[in-house]
């Protein structure tokens, strides 16, 4: 303020009655020195005078009165009162640094841009939003105003700390942090721990575009949807292994619905109806699949021979060892055996072929299918090899007995041509 008044003090020498500085000094109670006459008149000084006349008359007391009238009385913090006993809202240190910051006296355009109330507003923002008056009094430098770059950086840093879940420690006692956001005090609660009333679970009357406005209703809708999806996944994973357990679980879940009145009908949600349809289709398909497998198993068991013949389709099946064990267990002396040479000469049967003229079963007459010769050839080869290894050379053999013997050892293959 002193520099500004001294810059226009030349006006007392030329026109003392039209002097802006002398007129305000007489009406001011602040300790402002008298204007000297040692400032020479110049074109630059006239520009300063014209700009100063466009401004309102102000000093420290007038500024504080305008601030109190516009924004209300602001009580200074205790730390500022202790640092400056004669604190009236804006100290001399703060006003000097403020004037240097806006380059008063160095830039002609600065005065033209400072219209009515501009300085008051800027100083008020500095005192209320970013109060560093104590650091100004102690250090006399490094002032941070609300429009400076350092203030903006610190403000963004503070905002990031405020939005973070963990509040950082404040090392600088001269910095006043802004008020915390209401969202920072919001405590999240797990959905599973919320007790949802039973009447909220009924969404049958809601339209497709209607959304529950209540937070508890939204939570209940989300909780119900998650439960239905989990229940559906559980039923999809367990219906193949145990359809009976699925029915029991459905009955247990239905029994949990409590009906207060006998005439009262509990409406079912669309989600539960869709899930029930899906479960019915899956259950029907699983039962049909189980029935078909059981039918095939029973057919194989019915058509199998009474001698518990092994399955020729298995990988570990060997005809030679099985025939040998059957011959040893029966110990039949009336069955004739012969060597490979005698069999081929007298019966005229080639080693790798088998005649089906007398092959028949009690229930149905069987003709050899297309794929049967390859199987019978392997059976006949294994059987003859076993005969060559375990029997001696017998020259007399009956063709019919040999065929009947082979047929007796074979399992019933009638199910292959059904």
Swiss-Prot record:
GO cellular component: Golgi apparatus
Compositionally biased residues, Basic and acidic residues: 282-297
Bias type Polar residues, positions: 322-337
Low complexity biased stretches: 304-316
Positions of the UniProt region annotated as Disordered: 282-346
Protein name: Uncharacterized protein C9G1.07
Source taxonomy: Eukaryota, Fungi, Dikarya, Ascomycota, Taphrinomycotina
């Amino acid at each position: 303020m002193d520099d500004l008044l001294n810059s226009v003090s030349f006006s007392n020498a030329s026109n003392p009655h039209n002097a802006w500085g002398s007129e305000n000094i007489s009406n001011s109670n602040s300790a402002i020195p008298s204007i000297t006459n040692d400032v020479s008149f110049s074109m630059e000084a006239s520009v300063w005078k014209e700009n100063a006349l466009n401004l309102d008359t102000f000093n420290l007391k007038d500024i504080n009165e305008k601030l109190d009238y516009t924004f209300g009385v602001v009580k200074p913090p205790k730390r500022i009162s202790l640092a400056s006993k004669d604190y009236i809202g804006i100290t001399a240190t703060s006003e000097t640094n403020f004037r240097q910051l806006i380059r008063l006296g160095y830039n002609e355009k600065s005065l033209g841009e400072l219209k009515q109330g501009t300085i008051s507003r800027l100083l008020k923002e500095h005192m209320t939003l970013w109060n560093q008056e104590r650091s100004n009094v102690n250090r006399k430098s490094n002032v941070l105003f609300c429009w400076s770059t350092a203030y903006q950086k610190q403000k963004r840093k503070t905002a990031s700390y405020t939005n973070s879940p963990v509040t950082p420690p404040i090392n600088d006692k001269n910095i006043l942090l802004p008020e915390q956001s209401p969202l920072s005090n919001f405590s999240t609660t797990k959905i599973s721990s919320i007790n949802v009333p039973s009447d909220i679970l009924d969404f049958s009357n809601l339209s497709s575009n209607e959304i529950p406005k209540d937070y508890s209703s939204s939570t209940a809708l989300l909780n119900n949807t998650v439960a239905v999806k989990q229940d559906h996944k559980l039923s999809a994973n367990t219906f193949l292994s145990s359809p009976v357990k699925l029915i029991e679980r459905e009955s247990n879940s239905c029994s949990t619905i409590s009906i207060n009145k006998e005439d009262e009908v509990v409406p079912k949600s669309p989600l539960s109806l869709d899930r029930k349809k899906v479960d019915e289709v899956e259950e029907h398909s699983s039962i049909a699949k189980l029935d078909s497998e059981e039918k095939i198993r029973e057919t194989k068991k019915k058509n199998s021979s009474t001698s518990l013949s092994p399955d020729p389709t298995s990988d570990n099946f060997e005809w030679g060892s099985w025939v040998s064990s059957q011959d040893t267990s029966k110990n039949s002396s009336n069955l004739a055996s012969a060597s490979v040479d005698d069999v081929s000469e007298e019966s005229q049967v080639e080693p790798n072929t088998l005649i089906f003229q007398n092959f028949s079963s009690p229930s149905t007459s069987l003709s050899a299918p297309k794929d049967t010769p390859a199987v019978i050839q392997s059976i006949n080869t294994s059987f003859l090899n076993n005969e060559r290894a375990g029997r001696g050379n017998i020259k007399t053999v009956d063709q019919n007995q040999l065929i009947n013997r082979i047929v007796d050892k074979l399992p019933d293959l009638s199910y292959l041509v059904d």
